[in-house]
């Protein structure tokens, strides 16, 4: 990581004495580091230490799923509380805080006050796939500056991948990070961001341009920037560089970074269908989440996370109402038991092959 920052001009370029900086990891859920779901605490620890060494005033903050229950367990299980205790920095939950109204593209959003109060955000995403946005990277990680129920509301309002990605880019535009460092030591492919397959990648990606970082992360996964809505839309708005020809890659050659046989989410076959054709093909190409009763432990996290409340709990397992499901895959994100499986139409199965 220090090598990456040296090539960007050093830590002093991004942190100065007395500067208030918020470290924003990917704390998707209360899963331990070995699950590969959250930014590894060793990465968070290294960043916090470097920022403090530069004289900055540091806090760690995020808004995970099911945060309304309280985030104390999240801090403990992810290892972030141990980091905060070691360096005597604050852990900031965005739940229950005052929200600040912001307008982007004539759409209104409510951002947690602590995010606005800090002079800069140090963004620490993890290299993972995402069932809705394909890639959850530096741009998508900033979606976490919204308090929990605000995120759920946007999932409900914008269930389609491109529309939801547009909202994600709106939120990113409100508070672009001053630096993004992606934890790609162990990546996740398949049906991420909560229940994919872990892959050894051995990468730390860093950039002052979060959009360019995501463009490079896409190459790692075998994706062009225009295949990831958040990267394409953010680049089109001028929020960063999404043109690979204009991105200078340091430390590795382009041909070295792709991961062989990297699996994209099953839902990618549906996401590739243009919005104008999606309704026409909806009965032919579909991916539908289902709860595997044999794996479900009835923890209730999917019930709480569902933005349209189409999941109910029975005596044996959670059950999804297929008629009401909007295929946002929030249930898959938060399930700690890998109990959410993806049923696929015949044509979808053929396309995935």
Identify the meaning behind each predicted range.
Residues 1-293, 297, 303-308, 312-317, ...:
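N-terminal and secondary-structure boundary signal
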Residues 326-327:
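Extended, alpha-helix-rich binding/interface surfaces that flank or overlap catalytic cores
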């Amino acid at each position: 990581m220090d090598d990456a920052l040296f090539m960007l001009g050093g830590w002093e370029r991004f942190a100065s004495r007395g500067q208030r900086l918020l470290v924003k990891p990917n704390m998707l859920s209360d899963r331990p580091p070995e699950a590969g779901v959250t930014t590894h605490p060793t990465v968070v620890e290294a960043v916090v230490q470097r920022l403090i060494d530069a004289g900055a005033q540091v806090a760690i903050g995020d808004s995970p799923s099911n945060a309304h229950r309280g985030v104390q367990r999240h801090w403990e299980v992810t290892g972030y509380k141990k980091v905060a205790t070691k360096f005597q920095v604050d852990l900031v939950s965005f739940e229950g805080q005052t929200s600040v109204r912001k307008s982007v593209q004539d759409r209104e959003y409510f951002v947690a006050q602590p995010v606005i109060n800090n002079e800069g955000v140090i963004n620490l995403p993890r290299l993972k796939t995402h069932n809705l946005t394909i890639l959850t990277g530096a741009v998508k990680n900033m979606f976490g500056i919204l308090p929990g129920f605000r995120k759920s509301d946007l999932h409900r309002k914008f269930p389609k991948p491109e529309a939801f990605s547009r909202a994600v880019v709106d939120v990113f535009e409100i508070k672009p990070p001053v630096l993004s460092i992606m934890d790609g030591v162990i990546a996740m492919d398949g049906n991420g961001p909560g229940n994919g397959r872990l892959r050894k990648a051995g990468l730390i990606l860093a950039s002052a341009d979060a959009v360019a970082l995501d463009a490079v992360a896409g190459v790692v996964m075998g994706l062009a920037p225009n295949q990831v809505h958040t990267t394409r839309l953010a680049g089109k708005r001028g929020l960063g560089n999404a043109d690979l020809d204009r991105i200078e890659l340091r430390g590795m050659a382009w041909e070295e970074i792709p991961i062989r046989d990297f699996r994209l989410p099953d839902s990618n076959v549906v996401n590739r269908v243009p919005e104008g054709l999606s309704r026409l093909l909806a009965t032919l190409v579909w991916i539908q989440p289902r709860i595997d009763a044999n794996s479900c432990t009835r923890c209730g996290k999917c019930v709480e996370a569902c933005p349209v409340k189409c999941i109910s709990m029975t005596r044996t397992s959670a059950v999804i109402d297929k008629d009401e499901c909007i295929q946002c895959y929030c249930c898959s994100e938060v399930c700690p038991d890998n109990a959410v499986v993806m049923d696929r139409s015949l044509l979808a199965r053929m396309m995935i092959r």
